[in-house]
Amino acid sequence: MTQVAKKILVTCALPYANGSIHLGHMLEHIQADVWVRYQRMRGHEVNFICADDAHGTPIMLKAQQLGITPEQMIGEMSQEHQTDFAGFNISYDNYHSTHSDENRELSELIYTRLKENGFIKNRTISQLYDPEKGMFLPDRFVKGTCPKCKSADQYGDNCEVCGATYSPTELIEPKSVVSGATPVMRDSEHFFFDLPSFSEMLQAWTRSGALQEQVANKMQEWFESGLQQWDISRDAPYFGFEIPNAPGKYFYVWLDAPIGYMGSFKNLCDKRGDTTSFDEYWKKDSDAELYHFIGKDIVYFHSLFWPAMLEGSHFRKPTNLFVHGYVTVNGAKMSKSRGTFIKASTWLKHFDADSLRYYYTAKLSSRIDDIDLNLEDFVQRVNADIVNKVVNLASRNAGFINKRFDGVLAAELADPQLYKTFTDAAAVIGEAWESREFGKAIREIMALADVANRYVDEQAPWVVAKQEGRDADLQAICSMGINLFRVLMTYLKPVLPTLSERVEAFLNSELNWDAIEQPLLGHKVNTFKALYNRIDMKQVEALVEASKEEVKAAAAPVTGPLADFPIQETITFDDFAKIDLRVALIENAEFVEGSDKLLRLTLDLGGEKRNVFSGIRSAYPDPQALIGRQTVMVANLAPRKMRFGVSEGMVMAAGPGGKDIFLLSPDDGAKPGQQVK
């Protein structure tokens, strides 16, 4: 029977918009999607959302390296991410970005409420500054030794070994990730969220049973060591949202990232023209359920900062956090050199999505355990379970039904008690899906598959088919096999969406959880076609080799004007306004004796003459050709004494140098002396 319908909002952690989706990411998105698909099969109203985490210095710097704007980079990355998730049949209702109007408005709203309620504190801090790059260093651009567990090579905000969070200034022997320089200390005013004010609430939430035991235990350690105020601001230059009424200060990426869950849902509601659901799901007393699927590396942010921010701004807290472990490949950390750092898109060129969905599902539980993708075991398990046990059950029976009975199943079950055994298992399997004990669900289903195949072996329809006068028996046996196959595939539908579609086409019937108690009797099925192909180790070898080649290609240096000459540090409008650019007429141009780089230009500014030395000789071997051209010059540059004379300004040119220098000229109609604005 269908349960009482619940309203459920499910999220996955937001992938960072500076890199491709890999098989480590896919564990979480597959886990969440299987759970969501099960909930939908049971009749619940589920909104499944995600977004790209699109802010922060890493994105700003990578865009500079690529020679594009951050907006262009995150736009391209969003399309790539969405293509990958669609390829794995992740059934999102909405996929958005934290760099959105919805997220900006909600971030400012939450910040304003926290500030009005006294939970935002201002104070001047000493911050690490890269003297070579001329910028304050974000947490992730400082590395050193963890002050808690003394693990080396840890980031400036949290330790990946012990999970501790800290200030970058607490790191032992810090180094700038950008330049390798030893950072120096500089003062800057920052904004802090008063997390300790929420300690009592957070401890009560922890004891409420809303968290996995392992997470609750870890949180207790953090409570015992004492909660600290959380720095939620970053200094320019920074790609993100500027803090209201604080020029040059930006929200730290971890403030607006989880708000991205709300922003994506708001965007979904707006697309639907739904003006009520956002408040219904996020109001403080909401009876909707909210679940975050996340990795164990971001528990601190989701179990402390996020619920405290929501509480302090009068929004509801999550119903639960569903935390998973990491993915290893062949028993070791994913490795680019070994070809086991595998992108989602690369996987789909060599294997189907259902195969990985099945393997991950078979290994997952509700605990925070790491999952090993053993590629040899993967091949064996997919072939043994999906091909030999499940699909083979249909193929062993469908041929007889199609050829001998025109695709029509028997009017009665051959073994009603056996069929009841299969349908009675729905309670145990459903509970396993519900509680995220996915491995248990798969074991239960495969045990039933063994029973079904044993039934067919014992009944031996291939023998019965040769015996005269036993057509009714043959139809009954094969119909029984197909009905058992239907029940198995109904249980597997959350895991294997592509295979399920093919099965539904063959059965001429939807795989519906609530319909399994009624077998298909006297029902016409369609012609059986191959449902799933066996896989082999040659595909694995090709996958690994392709991953190695992608790493080599990615290592090739990025070129282009912005990559070769990155955009300089941001200046203010007042700084720019100091530069006086003027149109100038080149009255004369000549070589400079004793220099193989310079030309001497005589410039007319509309009544005032200037003498300028310019290093453009390599691009203009015939200086006479410049006479009569107009150009643009910096008119208020202090005169510079050179051994050839005094240079009274600078002409504007583009290009990397050598022959590739291009003197800038204004449009026709500009007059000497006019200001360039």
Curated annotation (Swiss-Prot):
Where in or outside the cell is it found? Answer: Cytoplasm
Cofactor requirement: Zn(2+)
Q: Which Pfam families match?
A: Anticodon_3, tRNA-synt_1g, tRNA_bind
Annotated keywords: Aminoacyl-tRNA synthetase, ATP-binding, Cytoplasm, Ligase, Metal-binding, Nucleotide-binding, Protein biosynthesis, RNA-binding, tRNA-binding, Zinc
**What's the main place this protein lives?**
cytoplasm
Cofactor: how and how many bound: Binds 1 zinc ion per subunit.
Q: What is its EC number?
A: 6.1.1.10
So what does this thing catalyse? tRNA(Met) + L-methionine + ATP = L-methionyl-tRNA(Met) + AMP + diphosphate
Residue window of motif 'KMSKS' region: 333-337
Q: Which BP terms from GO are recorded? A: methionyl-tRNA aminoacylation
Q: Which residues bind ATP?
A: 336
* Keyword Nucleotide-binding included in the entry's annotation: yes
> Where does the chain bind Zn(2+)?
146, 149, 159, 162
Where do the tRNA-binding domain residues begin and end? 575-677
The protein's matches in PANTHER family, at most eight in alphabetical order, are given as:
METHIONINE--TRNA LIGASE, METHIONINE--TRNA LIGASE, CYTOPLASMIC
Q: How does it assemble?
A: Homodimer.
Protein family membership: Belongs to the class-I aminoacyl-tRNA synthetase family. MetG type 1 subfamily.
NCBIfam families attached to this UniProt entry: metG, metG_C_term, PRK00133.1
Q: Which HAMAP family match?
A: Met_tRNA_synth_type1
Protein task: Is required not only for elongation of protein synthesis but also for the initiation of all mRNA translation through initiator tRNA(fMet) aminoacylation.
Record protein name field: Methionine--tRNA ligase
